[in-house]
């Protein structure tokens, strides 16, 4: 199994690469790419960690050597948020980066499963889909927006509030991956109940958690370490499913049946070909139903922005 990380010299990319080097199954290959000249050195640094995962780093304009034979590609390349910016402010720079990298994926490893981490995810996933479609290689069961950070944050905040162990909590999060489009389904956590005020406060905290980190880092970046952990969790789940493990479920932002929006984050059963089954979002509470209906316009605008970026 070969996993490629694009944007591997950045804060998220380095954290992700470290976790993959230590946790990928024995015999896996890990390929690191970034435009920055330090990237082969990051690979050498990680190569000294004693795990049976082969690692190689590539830098420069051309990502193709890193992509050859990849089964899974995780894209974290792009610029980070600074205080006062929202995820959509990143669009102007990151849209072009994602478009370029996905074109190279379409040419080099068109059958790979692709996880997009680069923000704004609501839009960059639509860009990736349109690029793959133009190249005639789009498989909607193999393209994912990685929203796992919203899930792990939800698990952490709920566990803190309720005095539970975080490993016992798993909160499904649906919708998109920014602001109001992030919708944690707090009504679906077995054995945990909340007051209306707790639901309103927790939902808001989960939606604004990225900004909490951006402000706390005081201009020094955005969430890189927790995002690295989230991306590693998603990437490792994908690898396990591709290798035949049964019952692997993760939420991610994918093209579904279009009931709510063309792309929508929902629970997915993963399998040997990527998505095996898009699972139901289940029964929503009145609060969740209202929040979902209220976000769809924002989400659809984000998606259209990505589609138009490729068609223009």
Curated annotation (Swiss-Prot):
GO molecular function: L-malate dehydrogenase (NAD+) activity
HAMAP family named among the record's database cross-references: Malate_dehydrog_1
Key word Cytoplasm present: no
Gene that this sequence comes from: mdh
Protein's job: Catalyzes the reversible oxidation of malate to oxaloacetate.
Amino-acid positions noted as binding NAD(+) in the UniProt annotation, renumbered to this chain: 7-13, 34, 94, 117-119, 227
Protein name per Swiss-Prot or TrEMBL: Malate dehydrogenase
Active site: 177 (proton acceptor)
Subunit-structure text: Homodimer.
Catalysis: reaction(s): (S)-malate + NAD(+) = oxaloacetate + NADH + H(+)
Lineage start: Bacteria, Pseudomonadati, Pseudomonadota, Gammaproteobacteria, Enterobacterales
Top-level taxon: Bacteria
UniProt-listed SUPFAM superfamilies: LDH C-terminal domain-like, NAD(P)-binding Rossmann-fold domains
């Amino acid at each position: 199994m070969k996993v490629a990380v694009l944007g591997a010299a950045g804060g998220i990319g380095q954290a992700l690469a470290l976790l993959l080097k230590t946790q990928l199954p024995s015999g896996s290959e890990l390929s690191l790419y970034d435009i920055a000249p330090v990237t082969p050195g990051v690979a050498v640094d990680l190569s000294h960690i004693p795990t049976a995962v082969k690692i190689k780093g590539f830098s420069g304009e051309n990502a193709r050597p890193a992509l050859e034979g990849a089964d899974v590609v995780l894209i974290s390349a792009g610029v980070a948020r600074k205080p006062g910016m929202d995820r959509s402010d990143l669009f102007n720079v990151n849209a072009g980066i994602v478009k370029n990298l996905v074109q190279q994926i379409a040419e080099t490893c068109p059958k790979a499963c692709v996880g997009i981490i680069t923000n704004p995810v609501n839009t960059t996933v639509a860009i990736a889909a349109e690029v793959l479609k133009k190249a005639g290689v789009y498989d909607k069961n193999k393209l994912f927006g990685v929203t796992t950070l919203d899930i792990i944050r939800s698990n952490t905040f709920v566990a803190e509030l309720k005095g539970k162990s975080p490993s016992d909590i798993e909160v499904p999060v649906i919708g998109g991956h920014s602001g109001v489009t992030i919708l944690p389904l707090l009504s679906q956590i077995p054995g945990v109940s909340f007051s209306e005020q707790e639901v309103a406060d927790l939902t808001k905290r989960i939606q604004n958690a990225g900004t909490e980190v951006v402000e706390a880092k005081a201009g020094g970046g955005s969430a890189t370490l927790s995002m690295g952990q989230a991306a590693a969790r998603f990437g490792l789940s994908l690898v396990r499913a591709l290798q035949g493990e049964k019952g692997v479920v993760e939420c991610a932002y994918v093209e579904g049946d279009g009931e709510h929006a063309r792309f929508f984050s929902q629970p997915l059963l993963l399998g040997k070909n990527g998505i095996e089954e898009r699972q139901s979002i289940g029964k929503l509470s009145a609060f969740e139903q209202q929040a979902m209906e209220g976000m769809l316009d924002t989400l659809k605008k984000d998606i259209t922005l990505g589609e138009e970026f490729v068609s223009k």
